[in-house]
């Protein structure tokens, strides 16, 4: 995924499209992640997505659902933003 992407549009299981603002991209243990927030909604909660490749070699975004993996991404995110302040 290009590091200069500011927004992405994701489609849910019901076909509803939602635009997300990309907060940051993280490289952790040879995997890539993006942290996003819904662009037009007032929410304080970010969503962590892992960048994987499908069978055709195309990049796909997969929700981080495993607690251990999510905690690793959250810790890296918090460390990154605490250093910027």
UniProtKB/Swiss-Prot annotation:
It comes from the Bacteria. It holds the Pfam family DUF1292. Disulfide bonds: none annotated. Coiled coil: none annotated. HAMAP family: UPF0473 (MF_01448). Belongs to the UPF0473 family. This is UPF0473 protein CLK_1946. It comes from Clostridium botulinum (strain Loch Maree / Type A3).
């Amino acid at each position: 995924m290009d590091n200069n992407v500011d927004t992405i549009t994701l489609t849910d299981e019901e076909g509803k499209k939602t635009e997300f603002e990309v907060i940051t991209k993280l490289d952790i243990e040879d995997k890539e992640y993006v942290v996003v927030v819904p662009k037009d909604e007032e929410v304080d909660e970010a969503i962590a997505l892992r960048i994987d490749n499908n069978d055709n070699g195309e990049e796909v975004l997969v929700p981080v659902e495993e607690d251990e993996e999510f905690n690793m991404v959250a810790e890296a995110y918090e460390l990154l933003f605490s250093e910027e302040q």
